[in-house]
């Protein structure tokens, strides 16, 4: 079907000959291949870079454990294809699970009234991190209505098993514009710094 064809084309693909590709958890153990459990993507192959020029420490970290650490998060599906879901620096680690900020953003962006969205993880004593969502809304839309749509849509994805139960945001913040980098990307580093002291207990 057209839907299956689109889904196939969005995959990164299968590793080629001589490529040893793994998806691992924080203890460098391979994650279960269940089409939803994600981990860090690491690889080794004869043609991969040996490291950084004049930076032995960074090179050592890059090849920690004998594999090149790509900095990407994803999973290998039941066909053996790699699907990248996020960057490891942007992943939200909550309740012992890795939650894709991009997946949350994709879901929320489809809600009526949302012009732009960013999902970030804020440090939490109990759960490690908790997700919060920053939304730039369409001017005429009511924030309470948008909140309801966002939580309902995320709840539906959780019920379907497409999202972890820990993905429900503790807080939704509204701004006129979401901060960008010099190349026009959402500046999540700045957002994490800006909202690091936010009280997630206040919904």
Where are these regions (language model features)?
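Conserved AMP-binding/adenylate-forming
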Residues: 1-82, 88-91, 104-105
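Glycine-centered tight turns that cap/initiate beta-strands
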Residues: 18, 113-116, 171, 177
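Active-site and channel-lining beta-strand-loop segments
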Residues: 20-27, 175-183
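Residues embedded in well-ordered beta-strands
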Residues: 20-22, 40, 118, 132-134, ...
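Short, charged helix-to-loop "capping" segments that act as catalytic/coupling loops
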Residues: 25-40, 153-170
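AMP-binding/adenylate-forming catalytic core of the ANL superfamily
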Residues: 45, 50-51, 73-167, 184, ...
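Conserved Rossmann-like nucleotide-binding pocket used by diverse enzymes
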Residues: 69, 174, 187
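Acidic/polar alpha-helix N-cap and adjacent early helical turns
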Residues: 193-203
């Amino acid at each position: 079907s057209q839907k299956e064809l689109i889904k196939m084309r969005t995959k990164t693909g299968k590793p080629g000959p001589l490529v040893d590709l793994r998806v691992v958890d924080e203890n460098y153990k391979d994650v279960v291949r269940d089409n939803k459990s994600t981990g860090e993507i690491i690889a080794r192959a004869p043609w991969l870079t040996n490291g950084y020029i004049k930076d032995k420490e960074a090179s050592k970290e890059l090849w920690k454990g004998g594999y090149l650490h790509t900095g990407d998060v994803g999973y290998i599906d039941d066909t053996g294809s790699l699907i990248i879901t996020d960057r490891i620096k942007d992943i939200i680690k909550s309740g012992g699970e890795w939650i894709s900020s991009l997946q949350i953003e994709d879901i929320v962006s489809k809600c009526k009234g949302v012009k732009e969205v960013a999902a970030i993880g804020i440090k939490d004593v109990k759960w490690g991190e908790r997700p919060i969502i920053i939304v730039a809304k369409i001017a005429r839309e009511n924030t309470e209505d948008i909140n309801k749509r966002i939580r309902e849509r995320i709840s539906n994805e959780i019920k379907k098993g497409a999202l972890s139960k820990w993905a429900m945001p503790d807080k939704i913040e509204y701004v006129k514009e979401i901060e960008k980098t010099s190349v026009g990307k959402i500046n999540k580093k700045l957002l994490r710094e800006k909202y690091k002291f936010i009280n997630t207990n206040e919904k």
